[in-house]
Swiss-Prot record:
Residues bound to Mg(2+): 9, 55, 63
Catalytic reaction annotation: ATP + [prokaryotic ubiquitin-like protein]-L-glutamate + [protein]-L-lysine = ADP + phosphate + N(6)-([prokaryotic ubiquitin-like protein]-gamma-L-glutamyl)-[protein]-L-lysine
HAMAP family hit by this protein: Pup_ligase
Protein name: Pup--protein ligase
PANTHER family, sorted: PUP DEAMIDASE/DEPUPYLASE, PUP--PROTEIN LIGASE
InterPro entries: Pup_ligase, Pup_ligase/deamidase
Keywords: ATP-binding, Ligase, Magnesium, Metal-binding, Nucleotide-binding, Ubl conjugation pathway
Organism from which the protein derives: Mycobacterium ulcerans (strain Agy99)
Gene Ontology biological process terms, A to Z: modification-dependent protein catabolic process; proteasomal protein catabolic process; protein pupylation
Binding site for ATP: 53, 66, 419
Miscellaneous information on this protein: The reaction mechanism probably proceeds via the activation of Pup by phosphorylation of its C-terminal glutamate, which is then subject to nucleophilic attack by the substrate lysine, resulting in an isopeptide bond and the release of phosphate as a good leaving group.
Length: 452
């Protein structure tokens, strides 16, 4: 499948610092954030005009699920649009707090752990054909996903009883299973719950919950681009060396704790391989695969960055990727800070900087400041993100959903939507079922809109 439907769900961390005496719990802060959403959507679980879903998840975490996208840059743009949508709610909620005499600054973090050790996720969704053998997909994909943090981790300072250490991934410490149907209790790498949001006879949705939330656009593109390409190669029957891991849960932590990528991890049957070895195998197969697949500039850009990042890890010279990979950008920032102020990695100011990197408020968040200085590479523009805040992708089913929502809101009609249904809540209860996520034009939807 060279044209694949993809989406990203991001849970955001939320906190608030108060100027006055009154304090609010995280639940109350989240309710302030969603008050405007509830006022027009009558719920804290809504679909937006751009086709995305916005809701309050378990544990007061705002969650944004992008609309269905069918290209990498489109997905990165809509992922960034989610940050802007949440930032808009943040500004509105701060104004409400001020109006009610509760002065406070609200912070939304696009990260994966809070100071109490709780974890929240970034979930990737990839459409795959039902006909394939799912066990082969998971067998080949698992070693790739365990070691993928080497190229696209968000980076984190982990405080251990011995010392502070820099890790590649925020999520690695919180993963407890390889393949499972749970998402919160045991946190697997691949979630098997079968909800295709499409024609179930044709498709299933691969739900990957091991990845970090990325701030840098090129890192997000690398994360989803490499995974989608590995899936494409599996579907095409490309042979891979067997890197079945003896213990994926131990391996994911070992990889995260080693920025050199050279630490050997145990494979099934007693063999060993390093994260670098494993990633090199998938990368070299991808380079070969590019010779036979349809040319695609975005996919070629991904493979180029993949190779340059592996070279950088191998040589430990990151100069050629230090504006493109989150954990490399962050580590360089910490090192400069430590040198300038003569401080240890365990200094609380570094932990503060670690958190501030993920602050999504423009003009305040550290990553945003780096990006403005040209220290983080982009694949999209502010104009494209602003457009994605208001408009759905034009090449997928999301267009139908977005146009239906916009028309119903403009006509003042009561409606219900989810990923596959568009329904007018009138006497006739007219409903259109959109089972094909690739279909951006549908006469039935046009007629439903015309009837409003």
């Amino acid at each position: 499948m060279q044209r694949r439907i993809m989406g990203i769900e991001t849970e955001f961390g939320v906190t608030c610092t108060f100027h006055g005496h009154r304090r609010l719990s995280p639940d109350e802060v989240a309710r302030y954030l969603f008050r405007r959403v509830v006022s027009w959507g009558r719920s804290s679980n809504v679909f937006l005009r751009n086709g995305a879903r916005l809701y309050l998840d378990v544990g007061s975490h705002p969650e944004y699920a992008t609309a269905e996208c069918d290209s990498l840059v489109q997905l990165v743009t809509h992922d960034r649009a989610g940050e802007w949508v949440l930032e808009d709610l943040l500004v509105d909620a701060e104004q409400r707090l001020a109006d009610e005499g509760i002065g406070g600054d609200i912070y939304l973090f696009k990260n994966n752990t809070d100071s109490a050790g709780n974890s929240y996720g970034c979930h990737e969704n990839y459409l795959i054909v039902r006909a394939g053998e799912f066990s082969r997909i998971s067998d080949v994909l698992l070693p790739f996903l365990v070691t993928r943090q080497l190229i696209c981790g968000a980076g984190k300072v982990l405080q251990t009883p011995k010392a502070a250490t820099f890790c590649l991934s925020q999520r690695a410490e919180h993963i407890w299973e390889g393949v499972s149907s749970a998402t919160t209790r045991s946190r697997p790498i691949i979630n098997t719950r079968d909800e295709p949001h499409a024609d179930a006879e044709k498709y299933r949705r691969l739900h990957v919950i091991v990845g970090d939330s990325n701030m840098c656009e090129t890192t997000t593109m690398l994360k989803v681009g490499t995974a989608s390409l590995v899936l494409e190669m599996i579907e095409a029957g490309v042979p891979f060396r067997d890197f079945s891991l003896d213990n994926p849960i131990r391996a994911i932590r070992e990889v995260s704790h080693d920025v050199t990528g050279r630490r050997p991890v145990r494979l099934a049957g007693g063999r060993q391989a390093s994260a670098l070895d494993i990633q090199r195998e998938y990368y070299s197969r991808a380079v070969e695969h590019l010779q036979t697949r349809e040319p695609n500039a975005q996919v070629e850009q991904v493979v180029d960055l993949w190779g340059r990042q592996l070279d950088a890890v191998e040589s430990q010279d990151f100069a050629k990727v230090d504006t493109e990979i989150d954990w490399v950008i962050k580590r360089k920032l910490f090192q400069r800070y430590q040198d300038r102020y003569n401080m240890e990695l365990s200094d609380p100011k570094i932990a503060q900087l670690d958190l501030a990197y993920h602050d999504i408020k423009r003009g305040r968040g550290v990553f945003d400041l780096l990006q403005r200085k040209g220290l983080a590479t982009r694949v999209t523009t502010d104009e494209e993100i602003a457009d994605a805040v208001d408009n759905p992708p034009q090449t997928t089913r999301a267009r139908l959903r977005g146009e239906f929502i916009s028309a119903a809101q403009a006509a003042g009609r009561d409606f219900t939507v989810d990923w596959v249904h568009l329904k007018l809540n009138d006497q006739a209860q007219r409903t259109v079922l959109c089972k094909d996520p690739f279909r951006a034009v549908d006469e039935r939807v046009k007629r439903l809109i015309a009837s409003m």
